């Protein structure tokens, strides 16, 4: 029986692509383990999947000054020792890393044990963890073809993003019943990220009188961002977040308005949903969402509205453009085969 160790954490985006791959390896009878941090979100997610989880010390890698930067390098070194010992006991054939600060000690620990390390980078440019880890990796899978120019060419393999199977199995009829929507009007699903997005939420609600004339709206507004005055608004359903219902909601969705996190937009791409992307500004991020969104716009998958340009009028204008050019977007979206990502990654894992 072949063995694999997965790692990645710090945010759900560094975990969910692993969950897309794991079921296929289970079918092939791989022995699967996961190494993450003591209290990260990856621990909560992975333990629900009935996968052996081993925690290690980890220090956060920051690009800015913080007093914790003095202590955290020592935590990283302890994490490397923890990971080295754990990997020596597990004796995996390969390590697959999805990035995030906890992955660095695991990658180095694997390299010290002479275990092949495969990385996956979701964004156009590598995050700090993967920048450090890539020198210890034998291969790095990229979601965007353009990412190759930022990485050692001899290690890069373009795959796209692995998408969880359950996302593709939504039920339109269940969504209609859950939302109380009509079949007669198209549906727009609006997602501002797990914490929501204040400017997007406010602008969407101001635009409702105009939008609801033609569309039904599902608004995932983030924790603490519900507007009680709109709870009974016909054609408008708001949620802090949804879990099991999301595939059904996406099945009934005609257009998506969203941030431009890589994992989410590749789910929309695989589902062939035209998108209006409002990426996080450079003031709130390292600019990766802007690059992601602009790549999708160039390929005809999405329209981009920059956060500083968001107004009621600009939002309505971009929604109308999505609707008017729906067929052109659909034609472009059909060119992408999302299933190839998992197949390619599984092939290289098996060959490692």
From Swiss-Prot:
Residues reported in the UniProt entry to bind UDP-N-acetyl-alpha-D-glucosamine: 11-13, 164, 194, 289
Gene name tied to this protein: murG2
Main enzyme class: transferase
Organism of this sequence: Bacillus anthracis
The protein's name: UDP-N-acetylglucosamine--N-acetylmuramyl-(pentapeptide) pyrophosphoryl-undecaprenol N-acetylglucosamine transferase 2
Pathway(s) per entry: Cell wall biogenesis; peptidoglycan biosynthesis
Stretches assigned to coiled coil: none
Disulfide bond entries: none
SUPFAM superfamilies named in the record: UDP-Glycosyltransferase/glycogen phosphorylase
Entry-linked HAMAP family: MurG
Purpose: Cell wall formation. Catalyzes the transfer of a GlcNAc subunit on undecaprenyl-pyrophosphoryl-MurNAc-pentapeptide (lipid intermediate I) to form undecaprenyl-pyrophosphoryl-MurNAc-(pentapeptide)GlcNAc (lipid intermediate II).
Family affiliation: Belongs to the glycosyltransferase 28 family. MurG subfamily.
Gene3D superfamilies assigned: Glycogen Phosphorylase B
Keywords: Cell cycle, Cell division, Cell membrane, Cell shape, Cell wall biogenesis/degradation, Glycosyltransferase, Membrane, Peptidoglycan synthesis, Transferase
Location(s), subcellular: Cell membrane
Gene Ontology molecular function terms on file: UDP-N-acetyl-D-glucosamine:N-acetylmuramoyl-L-alanyl-D-glutamyl-meso-2,6-diaminopimelyl-D-alanyl-D-alanine-diphosphoundecaprenol 4-beta-N-acetylglucosaminlytransferase activity; undecaprenyldiphospho-muramoylpentapeptide beta-N-acetylglucosaminyltransferase activity
Catalytic reaction(s) noted: di-trans,octa-cis-undecaprenyl diphospho-N-acetyl-alpha-D-muramoyl-L-alanyl-D-glutamyl-meso-2,6-diaminopimeloyl-D-alanyl-D-alanine + UDP-N-acetyl-alpha-D-glucosamine = di-trans,octa-cis-undecaprenyl diphospho-[N-acetyl-alpha-D-glucosaminyl-(1->4)]-N-acetyl-alpha-D-muramoyl-L-alanyl-D-glutamyl-meso-2,6-diaminopimeloyl-D-alanyl-D-alanine + UDP + H(+)
A Pfam family reported for this protein in Swiss-Prot or TrEMBL: Glyco_transf_28
Statement: the UniProt record of this protein carries the keyword Cell wall biogenesis/degradation: yes
Listed EC numbers: 2.4.1.227
Matches recorded under InterPro entries: GlcNAc_MurG (IPR006009), Glyco_trans_28_C (IPR007235), GlycoTrans_28_N (IPR004276)
């Amino acid at each position: 029986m072949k063995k694999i160790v997965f790692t990645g954490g710090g945010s759900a985006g560094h975990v969910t692509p692993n969950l897309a791959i794991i079921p296929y390896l289970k079918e092939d009878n791989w022995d699967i383990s996961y190494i993450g941090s003591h209290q990260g979100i990856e621990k909560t997610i992975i333990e629900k999947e009935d996968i052996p989880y081993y925690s290690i010390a980890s220090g956060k890698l920051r690009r800015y000054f913080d007093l914790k930067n003095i202590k955290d390098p020592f935590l990283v070194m302890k994490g490397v020792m923890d990971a080295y010992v754990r990997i020596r006991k597990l004796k995996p054939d390969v390590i697959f890393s999805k990035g995030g600060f906890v992955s660095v000690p695991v990658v180095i620990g694997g390299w010290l044990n002479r275990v092949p390390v495969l990385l996956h980078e979701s964004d156009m440019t590598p995050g700090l963890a993967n920048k450090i880890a890539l020198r210890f990796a034998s291969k790095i899978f990229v979601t965007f073809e353009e990412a190759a120019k930022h990485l050692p060419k001899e290690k890069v393999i373009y795959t796209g993003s692995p998408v969880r199977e359950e996302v593709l199995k939504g039920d339109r009829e269940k969504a209609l019943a859950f939302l109380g929507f009509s079949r007669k009007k198209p549906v727009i699903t609006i997602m501002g990220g797990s914490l929501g997005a204040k400017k997007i939420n406010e602008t969407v609600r101001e635009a409702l009188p105009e939008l609801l004339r033609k569309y039904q709206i599902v608004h995932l507004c983030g924790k603490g961002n519900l507007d009680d005055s709109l709870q009974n608004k016909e054609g408008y359903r708001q949620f802090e977040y949804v879990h099991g219902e999301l595939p059904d909601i996406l099945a009934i969705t005609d257009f998506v308005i969203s941030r431009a996190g890589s994992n989410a937009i590749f789910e929309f791409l695989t589902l062939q949903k035209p998108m209006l992307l409002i990426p996080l500004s450079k003031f709130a991020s390292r600019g990766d969402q802007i690059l992601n969104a602009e790549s999708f716009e160039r390929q005809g998958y999405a329209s981009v509205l920059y956060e500083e340009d968001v107004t009621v009028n600009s939002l309505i204008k971009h929604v109308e453009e999505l609707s008017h050019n729906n067929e052109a977007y659909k034609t472009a979206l059909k060119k992408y085969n999302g299933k190839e990502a998992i197949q390619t990654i599984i092939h290289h894992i098996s060959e490692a």
